[in-house]
Design a protein with these regions (language model features):
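N-terminal amphipathic alpha-helix/helix-capping segment at the start of soluble metabolic enzymes
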Residues: 1-19, 66-71
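Catalytic domains of carbohydrate-active enzymes, especially glycoside hydrolases
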Residues: 27-49, 101-106
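Structural preference for beta-strand elements that scaffold enzyme active sites
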Residues: 3-6, 14-16, 42-44, 76-82
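Active-site beta->alpha loop and helix N-cap motifs at the rims of alpha/beta catalytic domains
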Residues: 47-106
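Active-site mouth loops of central-metabolism enzymes
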Residues: 9-30, 80-99
């Protein structure tokens, strides 16, 4: 039997689509842990409006949230973020070094 591989985007796109990305990390990390225990091994964990909403609306640091996400799922789970093309996580185009930095960090 072939395995179907998929990526869970609910912790980025789901929050962004329904709640305007305004969800506190402490409120959803238990769900991340449960999803990981259920066997999900690939998550989209940030980027897009989620990155800036943490700073502007939640008073949280996006990098701290990503560190916590990694801690909860462990080292063997694949994480990725959404980049807005050449804007990366900003609202305006970014220079090449910023695009590369985003790719290297996330």
């Amino acid at each position: 039997m072939k395995k179907i591989k998929f990526q869970d985007t609910s912790f980025r796109d789901g929050f962004q689509s329904i709640f305007g990305a305004r969800v506190f990390a402490k409120d959803f990390m238990p769900a991340v842990e449960a999803a990981c225990k259920a066997g999900i091994t690939h998550f989209e964990a940030g980027g897009g409006a989620r990155f800036q909403a943490l700073y502007q609306n939640c008073g949280e640091d996006a990098f701290d949230m990503m560190d916590e996400f990694r801690r909860v799922v462990g080292p063997n789970v694949r994480l990725q973020t959404l980049a807005r093309g050449i804007n990366v996580v900003a609202l305006a185009p970014q220079p090449r070094d910023m695009i590369k930095l985003h790719a290297d960090m996330f």
